[in-house]
Amino acid sequence: EQFGHTTDILVRRAFGNVYDILFQGTPEQIERWLLPCVLGERVFSVAFTEPEAGSDAAAIRTLARKKSNGWQINGKKHFISDGAFSDFFVITAVTDPEKKHRGISTFIIDKNSSGVTVGRDQPMMGLRGTSHVELFFDDVQVGPEHLLGEEGRGLKHALETLGRIRLAQVCARAVGKATRVQKLSIDYASQ
């Protein structure tokens, strides 16, 4: 709630993206990817939204094909909050098209991986101090250690993460903003 007294960017940094890796990551993934973020050394974004999928998270088209040495990822995402200055991304991709929503998995993709392109910034009304970009994945190769959580459980993990983010960012921030407005109103009325 106290973060609601400040700018939205602080709330996003404090609560935004840790849940996927914290709850689904292996000890090695937590050490490699999450710990540097907690220490303030790295930043990452979740990249679930796609142009063709809209609000239907199960309709994503980014595809991860299993290879002998890991995965090959192709696709695009958009409206990725903080994507311009993130060091890596947690993304969802279809790993088994036949299984529909049970065929979506979650991956950790380093921004500097060959084939990762950060596209144009997509301005959002009322959200200052952040960016919302397009991401493109063209034959991005990742090892098996980049699969986050269980194969085929990515949509479930993503929706759980979004629920936690909404609780932390939206609800707590709204209460914080309301108490801040109340205090400012009382201070003004007392003058």
Predicted regions and their residues:
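Glycine-rich beta->alpha junctions and the first turn(s) of the following alpha-helix
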Residues: 116-191
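A short, Trp-centered hydrophobic/proline-enriched beta-strand micro-motif
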Residues: 40-48
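A short core secondary-structure module
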Residues: 74-118
